[in-house]
């Protein structure tokens, strides 16, 4: 006897989950992206890494991009004292320009507007210069250390493994000058929550340990500052060889990062300069910001949107699923460079 197959329609119920969050009491929260691009992927409610902070489903960029474009490892390399025109298209920087052609370039990226070096480094991790500039005091000289939330504070609170690598630092957490090392190029040293604790020696180390840490894949945020010979800072007199020096260093060290599993598995490398040269005939504040990632939107991608060192901090926070500091709450995010 033939068996009859009886079919019926079963309705499918779709549930829309909307998670909302407001600013937290410490001045951090989840901002809206002024670029209007953070929610374009339509995945702001995804299960990204930012869920633990309570912002993964928010309408702002720290939730949307933190979930949909979250980077597993973020690398940051900061060079010294060259404006945009001194690097982009320069014959003195062939390797760096090859990176620009293959990855992404922010063509309207600015330093903090406060000089010399130190205020720019501090802005990159705290969203503010922290003092009026005009000099580069040591980490233990007034008005430092300062008590202010910063990226190090956030990474520790979120239990995200990280380190700051300083070429030629020698002794970990070194607070004094030692040619060719300068503590003013390690901004994490200038905050009370780092300088006065055992974290200082654990997190601020000589660049010599970077290769082993990179191979181990332990850390999700890795800040790198080349020494005073390699960072591109021009000598006081001609010939000005800084761009050649930084390009030579980059040509040796950056390929090691690009060959690593940490980079290949969703990594993002930000290569930038602390401040513009400021000499006659040069831009006062415009500097290169090169975004390098296997997930770059397209080879040679460029954006003329107005970005700055504050945007860098906001972007790192978004990619790692961290709530934004109040100092960068309304800053645009550079996640448009990523797929």
Put a short name on every predicted segment.
Residues 16-67:
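Ser/Thr-rich, Pro/Gly/Ala-heavy low-complexity intrinsically disordered linkers and tails
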Residues 1-19:
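Sec-dependent bacterial lipoprotein signal peptides
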Residues 22, 33-36, 63-339:
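N-terminal pro-sequences and low-complexity stem/linker regions of secreted or lumenal proteins
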């Amino acid at each position: 006897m033939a068996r009859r197959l009886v079919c019926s329609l079963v309705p499918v119920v779709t549930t829309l989950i909307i998670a909302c969050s407001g600013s937290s009491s410490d001045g951090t929260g989840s901002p809206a992206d002024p670029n209007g691009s953070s929610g374009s992927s339509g995945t702001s409610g995804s299960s990204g890494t930012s869920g633990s902070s309570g912002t993964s489903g928010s309408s702002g960029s720290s939730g949307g991009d933190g979930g949909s474009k979250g980077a597993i490892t973020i690398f940051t390399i900061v060079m010294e004292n060259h404006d945009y025109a001194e690097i982009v298209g320069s014959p003195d920087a062939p390797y760096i320009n090859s990176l620009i052609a293959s990855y992404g370039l922010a063509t309207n990226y600015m330093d903090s507007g406060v000089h010399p070096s130190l205020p720019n480094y501090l802005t990159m991790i705290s969203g503010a210069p922290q003092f009026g500039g005009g000099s580069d005091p040591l980490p233990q000289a007034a008005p430092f250390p300062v008590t202010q939330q910063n990226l190090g504070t956030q990474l520790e609170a979120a239990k995200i493994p990280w380190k700051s690598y300083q070429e030629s630092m020698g002794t970990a957490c070194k607070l004094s000058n030692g040619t060719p090392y300068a503590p003013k190029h390690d901004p994490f040293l200038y905050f009370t929550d780092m300088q006065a604790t055992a974290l200082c020696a654990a997190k601020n180390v000589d660049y010599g340990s970077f290769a082993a840490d990179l191979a181990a894949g332990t850390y999700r945020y890795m800040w790198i500052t080349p020494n005073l010979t390699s960072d591109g800072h021009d000598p006081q007199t001609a010939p000005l060889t800084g761009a050649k020096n930084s390009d030579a260093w980059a040509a040796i060290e950056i390929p090691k990062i690009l060959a690593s599993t940490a980079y290949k598995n969703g990594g993002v490398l930000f290569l930038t300069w602390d401040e513009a040269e400021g000499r006659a005939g040069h831009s006062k504040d415009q500097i290169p910001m090169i975004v390098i990632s296997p997930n770059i939107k397209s080879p040679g991608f460029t954006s003329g949107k107005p970005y700055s060192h504050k945007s860098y901090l906001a972007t790192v926070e978004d990619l790692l699923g961290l709530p934004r500091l109040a100092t960068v709450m309304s800053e645009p995010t550079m996640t448009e460079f990523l797929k």
